[in-house]
Amino acid sequence: MSLLLGTYRLATRVLEPLAPRVLAYRARKGKEDPARINERLGHPGVARPAGALVWMHAISVGESLSLLPVIALLAERRPDLSVLVTTGTLTSARMMAQRLPDGVIHQYAPVDAPGAVSDFLDHWRPSLGLLVESELWPNLILEAEARGIPLMLASARITEHSAEGWRKRPAAARALLEAFACILPQDEASAGRIRALGGRDDGRVNLKLVGAPLPFDRKEFDRLSGAIGDRPVVVLASTHEGEEAALVQRLLTLDPLPFLIVVPRHPERSGTIEADMAALGLTVAVRSRKEVPGADTQVYLSDTLNEMGLFLRLAEVVVLGGAFGPLIGRAPGGGHNPLEPARLARPTLTGPDMSNWSIAGAMAEAGGLKILTDLSRLAPRVAELLANPAQARVLGRQAEQAAAGADGGLEVLWQAMAPLLPPAGGR
């Protein structure tokens, strides 16, 4: 073990007694579920089912949702296996509660401290661990390796910034990456960085490129469609802090103003967004308060979870957030999944920071995504698409075709996973 990892493990052991206090503080700030803090300390909330169990871990909403096709694949090909999913954020836990199939267990991931990790693994005894993207928690990884639990890193992603940090700690990087029995980078850039740091490369898998159109509630669609009437709808999807006010302010130049649906990435920001809209002189209805849009409603604030499929279907134009940071003086967000509106043939505009989505460039080249490098172009582009439904349909079809051609490598994942699973009926 490298000196750095040894120091990290010692430090986390010494500091672990403070974890309950830190978690309680975070719960008071709304960043932890106070009813489930024990899970973060490695103490399970439910009993372990008998037989073999596959453990899957992802940190936040996007990564967590990307596990759903894998879970469906396991249910089809290895129905004898139990599945445990761990996530790290409140939002992802709430989303998983709504989206996980019956029988799949969700728990919060333990904090990366030796005692919590040991208790977690003692209870769940996974036959295989599947981690998504860049979840390199030293205690969790090294303890699983020490117990002989095979680990996979799927959709592995290491940015140049992260790689630069790991290059300064080569022994630690190598030790963590060598703990994985299989690494499936999501793109060539990440693959090259992982190989350079001493990790293996077992093929390309990007789970965020796998998936069906988002689900929706037909009754809610009909109800909202009736409330909105014949007003054109523009959806601001997965917006980040600062984007709502900046984007809506530009759209105020449109006459008439389209009906705006704002779906923030983090619904807990609802109060701030509502205040921002009121400051712009707009009338707002808030979904979490069960308010129905009226004839005078200009902005519908969707501060709920698991309803993106509903709102995308209501849209004539989608403005995809998380990508406008460079244009509004905010930190980079990396963008959000352009395939979600594309699978529904929705014409989509987004900002220049799509660094988390290598497919965005190909979609833009194919005409299925419009990337704005200047916010002054937002209102004219939206106006053009609303005034020319035929052009909007062409853009939507191009987006849909680009989504249909995306291959996330689910079969590659299965071929790599199958040999690591216990035999049917095993433990």
What are these regions (language model features)?
Residues 1-427:
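Nucleotide-activated sugar donor-binding and catalytic core shared by glycosyltransferases
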